Amino acid sequence: MDLTQIQNPSFLKDMSISELEGLSEDIRKFLIEELSQTGGHIAPNLGVVELTIALHKLFDSPKDKFLWDVGHQSYVHKILTGRAKEFGTLRQYQGLCGFPKRCESEHDVWETGHSSTSLSAAMGMALARDLKKTKEYVIPIIGDGALTGGMALEALNHIGHEKTDMIVILNDNEMSIAPNVGALHNVLGRLRTAGKYHWVKDELEYILKKIPAVGGKVAATAEKIKDSLKYLLVSGVFFEELGFTYLGPVDGHDYEKLFETLQYAKKTKGPVLVHVITKKGKGYKPAESDVIGTWHGTGPYKIESGDFVKPKEVAPAWSAVVSETVLKLARTDERIVAITPAMPVGSKLEKFQKEFPDRMIDVGIAEQHATTMAAGMATQGMKPFLAIYSTFLQRAYDQVVHDICRQNLNVFIGIDRSGLVGADGETHQGVFDISFLRHLPNMVIMMPKDENEGQHLVYTAMQYEDGPIALRYARGNGLGVHMDEELKAIPIGSWETLKEGTQAAILTFGTTIPMAMEAAERLEKAGVSVKVVNARFIKPMDEAYLHDLLGKNIPILTIEEACLIGGFGTGVVEFASENGYHSALVERMGIPDRFIEHGSVTKLLEEIGLTTDAVVDRIHTMIPSKQKRA
C-alpha cells in the first residue's frame, strides 16, 4: 500500500484482519526505511503498529481523543492521519515534528514530549466532555515506563475516585527508554503471568469447600488465605483497587484479541484500563534485541547491518566527560553516589553502574523523587551526583527550591543537555535552567568552556561543601582539547580572560565561547579591539572582575545559549544598576521569549540570530566608530 496516499484513518473501517496485517508490514517497512535516513524513535513505534491501527479502526479520531504519553510513539498515528509524505522532513527545521503537534493535525489533540502527562490531560478532557454533555471517547495511551511517574499515579487515583468514563491503554513493553525499575514494574510483571492465578484460585476454592464448618477460626483463616492469594496473584488487582475495570493482559500484536478487548472496553462504564503487551522494536531485529535502550531513539543507520551512521568523533561527549570524572573521583571517595531518573545510557553512567552498582541509583521516570532523595542522602554526609537533563529538571523545581536550596544541602546537579538540543524541539530544549536557578539562594551555577575545564569543574563541585552546586553541559561532543591528568579546584565565582581588548568586551560561557572568539578575531582584523571573558561561573558572578570592567566604561555584550529573561545577561545588567554604573552600555544576546522549535542546532542558532556574524554586527553598532566592518 502507498502510505503517502493516506488522507485520514477512515479507510481502516472496511479492512479485514488479513488486510490489516499487510498494512502492518507496510508501515514497519516504511518506518525502517524512512528513519534509516532521518533518525528518530524507531523502536517505540515499531512496537505499537497493530495497537495504533486497532485504535483508529474502532474509534473515530478526531472526535474520539487519542493522547499519546511522551509522544515519541506517535509516528504510526501520524501515518494514518495523512502525514506519511512528510516523513522525509522528520525532526528537521520546519519539518514534521517527532511528537504530536496540535498545529500539524486535528488528530493531534494533545502535545507531549515529557512523560506521565497524558492521564491528567485526559481527565481534563473527559470532565469537559461531561460538563458539555457531549459523547466521545477519551483514550490516553501510556507506557509502563511513564506509568512510574508520580503525576501519572496521581491521575490514576483521581480518575478512579471520580469513576470518570475513560479508556486508558497501558502499552507494556517492559521498557521505557532503558529497562524499567521499581515496584510497579514488578506488579506489571506479575500481571503478565497472571493466568496462573485462575488455576490456583479454582484449586483453592475446591479445597475450601472441603473444610468442615467447625468454627469461626477455621473459616476466617481460610478467607484470609484466599484474600492473600488474590492480592499476590489476581490479574489487575492494583488497578481494580484504584477504581478501574482492568482488561488484559492482551497481545498487542494480535488483531482479534485487540478488537475483542477494545470493543468490551467501549461498552464498559467508568474508567477502564486495557493492559496491552507489545514488543519494542518489533519487526526489525537490531531494535528487537536491544535491552539497554540504544534503539529507543537513533540517528541514521544502515538497515542491513544495523550500524549507526555517525560522523567520526574527534572529541568525547560532554556527558561522558562529566560522568567519567565523577567515576574517577568515586574510586577514592565512597561517599559519592550517582542518581539518574531513567537516563543511565543518555547520561553515560553505564561505567559507573558497572563498577559501583550499589552506588548508582536509577529511580525511573521520577525526577521529583530523585531530587529529594539526593537531598536526603546529602543530610547523611553522602555526596550525591544528580545527573538530569535540563528539560527534565523543570519537573523537579519545587524539590530544588524547597528541599535542596532552602536547606543548603551539598547536592551536585549535573544539568545535561543544557542549551539547544535540536531535533527533539520545543519540549526538550535546555534553555530555561539558568532563569529558574539563578535567583535561588545558595545555588552555584557553572558551565565550562571546554571538556578540560569541565573535568576541573566536576572536581570543584565535589570539593564544594557550602551548599548546592550545578554544572551545565551541552548535548554532543566537546572540542577535542588536551585533558590534564591532575584535577584541580577552580575558585568559586572566578572568571578568566580569553582575549584582551580595549574597545568592547564580550562576556559568555560554554558553547558560545567559540562564537565569541571567532567574532573577536574578525573584529581585531577590522581594527576593533574586543576583550573576551569566560564567565564560567554564572552564579556567583566574578564581582571584582565586573567592577573593573564596568569601571572602564566600555560597551559590554553578553551572549548565552539560554533564555534572555532572567538569564546571565540580566544578572550583569542588575549588577551594573545596583552598583551605580548607570552609564554602562550592556546589551544581551540569547534565546528570545518564545519556545524554540525542532531543527539542527546550527539552523536554530541562525534563526534566532545567535551567530558569529550577528555578534560582529552587534559590536559594530555598540561602538561609535567608523571602523571598516569585518
Swiss-Prot record:
Chain residues that bind thiamine diphosphate: H72, G113, H114, S115, G145, A146, N173, Y284, E367
InterPro entries, per the entry: Dxylulose-5-P_synthase, THDP-binding, Transketo_C/PFOR_II, Transketolase-like_Pyr-bd, Transketolase_BS, Transketolase_C, Transketolase_CS
GO biological process: 1-deoxy-D-xylulose 5-phosphate biosynthetic process; isopentenyl diphosphate biosynthetic process, methylerythritol 4-phosphate pathway; terpenoid biosynthetic process; thiamine biosynthetic process
GO-annotated cellular components: cytosol
Pathway per the UniProt entry: Metabolic intermediate biosynthesis; 1-deoxy-D-xylulose 5-phosphate biosynthesis; 1-deoxy-D-xylulose 5-phosphate from D-glyceraldehyde 3-phosphate and pyruvate: step 1/1
SMART domains: Transket_pyr
One Pfam assignment: DXP_synthase_N
Cofactor note: Binds 1 Mg(2+) ion per subunit. Binds 1 thiamine pyrophosphate per subunit.
PROSITE patterns, per the entry: TRANSKETOLASE_1, TRANSKETOLASE_2
Residues given in the record as Mg(2+) binding sites: D144, N173
Catalysed reactions listed for this entry: D-glyceraldehyde 3-phosphate + pyruvate + H(+) = 1-deoxy-D-xylulose 5-phosphate + CO2
Alphabetical keyword list: Isoprene biosynthesis, Magnesium, Metal-binding, Thiamine biosynthesis, Thiamine pyrophosphate, Transferase
Enzyme class: transferase
Required cofactor names: Mg(2+); thiamine diphosphate
EC nos: 2.2.1.7
One MF term in the entry's GO annotations: thiamine pyrophosphate binding
NCBIfam families assigned: dxs, PRK05444.2-2
Known function: Catalyzes the acyloin condensation reaction between C atoms 2 and 3 of pyruvate and glyceraldehyde 3-phosphate to yield 1-deoxy-D-xylulose-5-phosphate (DXP).
Assembly: Homodimer.
UniProt family annotation: Belongs to the transketolase family. DXPS subfamily.
Identification of the protein by name: 1-deoxy-D-xylulose-5-phosphate synthase
